Amino acid sequence: MSTLTRFSVQPLSTMTRRLADVASARREPDLVIQGARVLSTYSERFLDGREVWISGGRIAAVKPAGSYRGGSAKLYDARGGIIAPGLVDPHIHIESSMVTACAYAEAALLNGTTTIFCDSHEIGNVMDVAGVEAMLEDARQAPLSIFLTVPSTVPATTPDLETAGGDLTPDKIAALFDKWPEAVALGEKMDFVPVAMGDERSHAILAAALGRGRPVSGHVYGREFVAAYAASGVTDTHEAIDRGIADDLLEAGVWIFLRGGPPTTPWHSLPQAIKTITELGASHKRVAVCTDDRDAEDLLAFGLDWVTREAVKYGMRPEEAWAMGSLHGATRFGMEGEIGGLGGGRRADLVLLSDDLTPVSTWYGGKLVVDSKKITPILDEALSKPYRYPDAAYHTVKLPKNLKLTPDLPTETVVAHTIKTELPGITLGHVTVTLEPANDWQAHFDKHDLCFVTVVERHGKSAGNVAHGLLNGFGLRQGAVASSVGHDSHNIIVAGTNAADMQVALDAIEEKQGGVCVVMDGKVTAMVPLPIAGLLSDKRVHQVADEVKALKLEWEKAGCTIAYMGFNLIPLSVIPEIRITDKGLVLVPEMVISPLFEKA
């Protein structure tokens, strides 16, 4: 947990006598929250007329109203509001929010989240172990409880299919577990096909975690893989996208994290997956909710509190939903004795809720950090002193000159393998299109709704790998869009209708050492600079959210049919059916490279 002194809480083992004295009224509490209804995540009930006694950043007791007779304790009047445990997000990627861990903390606490379990495979793919450890140092200084699920699949596939900046081998992963107490689990094992097929490296990574008693998080598509996946030691996944696979996973002993996200993004699988409970009758006891990926704007507007309310919207009782958002995530990682509930001895990570489960105020380690939906001075001070990443993190975009960004125009009839983009943007279709000889590319674009897509290796590990492709149905009619957040190897992906605008976009990203941008008529019309590893801004979350909002407006004006976070997934070579990396077009079911054109 955070090592920031102002928010640190002593281990329970050193506080038992103190807490027992406070609970028995032999010692004054530091803080008493009065006039509250308590949401018990243990019994899943609302308890009227309660007060919460806090000492040393921990809960001493929850008592009937009027139990505190007066003394030196600070009093807080909840005015009939709901006091609940802070939310626990069991699966997120901080880097998707494009902010540092310190900046992320502000948005999390505003939304009532006090603990997160972060898989930092994004920065691991760029900077290897050094990136993961820099993120851990950032997390240690952030005013939030941040635990690491060690990245398990870096790179996502093999060097034959893509070039990554990092390579987290079984030995490196084992060393991270041994060095960092915050490393509590193995992050999502995305290579579910190699796991199911018994791949040696994949299972050596599993052994590095399981041999140390660490749980393993997963990522699996396809009911046919569930049995082998569970048998390999994977015990949670956030990729339960419908009630069928969710039911299979629960029966196989795998926790499921219902992922909720704005409908315009690829992340909103909760409405379908929750039907394993509401329609098939499964218990919710091994079900939690998570956010997975959020940009900075959506992080503020659609936090884990919103996902919890979505669970209510789709059939759960409020008490059940809040338990899924707090206690269940804690229990999955064996931390229910520390967080996730209001039991005696637990950390005083609390949230005051309105009747519709909207966070109003937040306490972190017994300190009031959000009051009436505004951050307090103690939190503002902590946020104003962020961790400084190593200098190497600011120099990760390494591009050769004179890159060829578009394919040659075919001079004979060919069959083109195109990438079909459809909402919400997770899976991409493999569509072949016959291209007859034409005077220019625009004729093909107009006839088949195509545009260029190019991936450029940016880690300085190749002689400048550049792969060309064609997007089908992306909607871009002019200009270019580009990003240094091309999952998961985070090479640069640029789409456009002409090489000149694509080059302007690439130059802008190189100049800022990372970012996402839109270019029209040779000018950058919107950009979110990401100078840290080409993934993160060094600004506060509200500043980045404003930049993201402006980017989205220009993105829509350009005609793009999928949001930029979906665009960032186009190189993700572990999700069907077809992807593009710096090595070329990847046919995911076969895990082979395909040429862009074949003779008709």
Swiss-Prot record:
Cofactor(s) of this protein: Mn(2+)
Keywords: Hydrolase, Manganese, Plasmid
Record bears the keyword Manganese: yes
Catalytic activity: adenine + H2O + H(+) = hypoxanthine + NH4(+)
Domain of life according to the entry: Bacteria
EC annotation from Swiss-Prot or TrEMBL: 3.5.4.2
GO MF annotations in UniProt: adenine deaminase activity
Coiled-coil segments: none
A biological process term (GO) from this entry: adenine catabolic process
Record bears the keyword tRNA-binding: no
Pfam families: Adenine_deam_C, Amidohydro_1
Family designation: Belongs to the metallo-dependent hydrolases superfamily. Adenine deaminase family.
Name listed for the protein in its UniProt record: Adenine deaminase 3
Gene name for this UniProt entry: ade3
